[in-house]
Curated annotation (Swiss-Prot):
This is Anterior gradient protein 2. InterPro entries: AGR/TXD, Thioredoxin-like_sf. It is found in: Secreted; Endoplasmic reticulum. Monomer and homodimer. One of its GO terms (biological process) is positive regulation of cell-substrate adhesion. Its main location: secreted. A motif (Homodimer stabilization) lies at residues 34-43, 49-56. The lineage of its organism: Eukaryota, Metazoa, Chordata, Craniata, Vertebrata. The gene is agr2. Residues 1-20 form the signal peptide. One of its GO terms (molecular function) is identical protein binding. One of its GO terms (cellular component) is endoplasmic reticulum. Belongs to the AGR family.
Length: 164
């Protein structure tokens, strides 16, 4: 009886291993922190981590609020990722993109909308002086505004150096 049980156990284990190997592996797209905004850049995972790195590394933070189902967010993401100047200059920033608005009221500035790009300096002050071109949604950018975003990134770095 004991021999039969051992044999059945070995047979059960062997069958399980064989079946497990034959199951097709589900194809899954690897999701990185960049979410397509710049795969070669270093991104932080949370707002708190972004603030900490901005302060300790003495770099401004770029916070991008967006949604994966928003056509305006998707268009800006494409323009941001394809702009070589932005991709190069972004290396001088702490980068965070979130698919929701953080609970920090300082970042709501002029309302809840996406896409929204906000700069935070290393002293943890939101840079309200670096808006986009729209008066009703001051921190939004469209693909046609990508050069303005690039200029605001440059200003965030220049002002950082003169303020500290």
């Amino acid at each position: 009886m004991e021999t039969v049980l051992k044999t059945l156990f070995v047979l059960l284990v062997a069958t399980s291993l064989t079946l497990a190997k034959d199951l097709p592996q589900a194809t899954r797209v690897l999701q990185t922190l960049s979410r397509g905004w710049g795969d070669n850049l270093e991104w932080v995972q949370t707002y708190e981590e972004g603030l900490y790195k901005a302060k300790t590394e003495n770099k401004p933070l770029i916070l991008i609020n967006h949604r994966n189902d928003c056509p305006h967010s998707l268009a800006l993401k494409k323009a941001f990722a394809e702009h070589q100047g932005i991709q190069k200059l972004a290396e001088e920033f702490v980068l965070l993109n979130v698919v929701y608005d953080p609970t920090d009221k300082n970042l709501q500035l002029d309302g809840q909308y996406v896409p929204k790009v906000v700069f935070v300096d290393p002293s943890l002050v939101v840079r309200a002086d670096l808006p986009g071109k729209y008066s009703n949604h001051q921190y939004t950018y469209e693909p046609a505004d990508i050069d303005l975003l690039f200029e605001n990134m440059k200003k965030a770095l220049i002002l950082l150096k003169t303020e500290l």
